UniProtKB/Swiss-Prot annotation:
One protein family per Pfam: Lipoprotein_9
Protein's recorded name: Lipoprotein 28
Gene Ontology biological process terms, A to Z: D-methionine transmembrane transport; methionine import across plasma membrane; methionine transport
UniProt keyword list: Cell inner membrane, Cell membrane, Lipoprotein, Membrane, Palmitate, Signal
Superkingdom in the source lineage: Bacteria
Its membrane topology: Lipid-anchor
Intracellular or extracellular location(s): Cell inner membrane
Family the UniProt entry places it in: Belongs to the NlpA lipoprotein family.
Segments traversing the membrane: none
Lipid addition sites, N-palmitoyl cysteine: 24
């Protein structure tokens, strides 16, 4: 999924929260029940497998609460309507905690939905020529992520101390004199057919529409040690609860890994 850096908490969002959570009690106090927020679609399909594993292995009843986007799950978890959620990576959580004063913590890794470099012109990093044009996302989180991936491949060097949000201005060494083109994430799959673009760095969210597989069709790709691995998130006050631990163990199971491999066409790399 694509997680943007800035989110608006509007009156409409609060109304939507009320609709989504209407009729729902506070998060469960039953050790054999857990309420987990997920994003509708493929990610919920993966969570459904974890739900089945939790019931079979631990007798844990998992109630999945679906959301249409990343605006509300942290708010609902922080205020106790959910026990946990599973949809985001650590940089997103850290930003949301800082922006809204949430007391949320990561309790374990789930999947890396990897960003990768794709091309219809080359097959390996060694084939990237002097002066090649590399298209990357232009939103701050994913732009920084793409630059860090280029650095991992030793194509550029970034200024130290920039953390997870470097910009093109922080490139200190560019031995192949790559031309960095910043575009909206949704446009990146289309530029694979642009004769002026040699490589495009694209998130799993947008590459899925092309039928390409991050694992099988990319020139280079993030690995499971990526700081952008997705996480199971709970509150400070319930992070050690037995139901949270059992759901994490269920999610980090071979059954879930196998299902995610199929559901995401190789675009979900186990991060545990």
């Amino acid at each position: 999924m694509k997680l943007t850096t800035h989110h608006l908490r509007t009156g409409a969002a609060l109304l939507l929260a009320g609709i989504l959570l209407a009729g729902c009690d506070q998060s469960s106090s039953d050790a054999k029940h857990i309420k987990v927020g997920v994003i509708n679609g493929a990610e919920q399909d993966v969570a459904e497998v974890a739900k089945k594993v939790a019931k079979e292995k631990y007798g844990l009843d998992v109630e999945l609460v679906g959301f249409s986007g990343s605006l509300l799950p942290n708010d609902a978890t922080n205020h106790g309507e959910l026990d946990a959620n599973v949809f985001q990576h650590r940089p997103f959580l850290e930003q949301d905690n800082q922006a809204h004063g949430y007391k949320l913590v990561a309790v374990g890794n789930t999947f890396v939905f990897p960003m990768a470099g794709y091309s219809k012109k080359i097959k390996t990093v060694a084939q990237i020529k002097e002066g090649a044009t590399v298209a990357i996302p232009n939103d701050p989180t994913n732009l920084g992520r793409a630059l860090l991936l280029l650095q991992k491949e030793k194509l550029i060097t970034l200024k130290e101390g920039k953390g997870l949000l470097p910009t093109a201005l922080d490139i200190t060494d560019n031995p192949r004199h790559l031309q960095i083109m910043e575009l909206e994430g949704a446009q990146l799959p289309r530029v694979l057919d642009d004769p002026k673009v040699d490589v495009a760095i694209i998130s799993t969210t947008y590459i899925q529409q092309t039928g390409l597989s991050p694992v099988h069709d990319s020139v280079f790709i993030e690995d499971k040690n990526s700081p952008y691995v997705n996480i199971l998130v709970a509150r400070e006050d319930n992070k050690n609860a037995e139901n949270v631990k059992e759901f994490l163990q269920s999610y980090q199971s071979p059954e879930v890994a196998k299902a995610a491999e199929t559901i995401f066409n190789g675009g979900a790399v186990p991060g545990w």
